[in-house]
Amino acid sequence: RLRDDFFAYHQSRTSLFLKNIRKKSYTEIIHLPDPQAVRDGRTVVAFSDILHGGTVYYTTGEFILHLENIVSMLKKYENIHVCLVSGETDTRYMVYAKRDVGVIVAKTSSPPIILAINEKNMTAAFWDYLTHMAGDKAYSSPNNRKIAKTLSDYIRLLKS
């Protein structure tokens, strides 16, 4: 029953997301982990710490499927964009922001905590932080073709 409820919820969220991206822009900031970390099964599935079963890690095949889905969406939807960041990133939290609306900050390490913020100045500060992290040029002038190629090259590296 829980599995069916979760699947129905997932389908509903996916459907709403696909409807929204026809009209609104969506940008994800991604750090590609070291390929060996992926092969060794050390890449954490986002938000898996929040579930009662503990942290869940991608298999190499699952991570490849995830990236292939991103590449497919970059090619199919003009309002979806990805900014790749280099260097180390803190994986203990995730930040979701909607400009002029609000921010969700989720601490993904144990114990998990989720904060929803809709105060105007805080939202603006997080928005500035995220656009700076993505790179102002990469954010304001996204190049989906270039990012799709970079992700495809990374996928080939994982498969080799």
Predicted regions and their residues:
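Hydrophobic protein-protein interaction segments
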Residues: 1-159
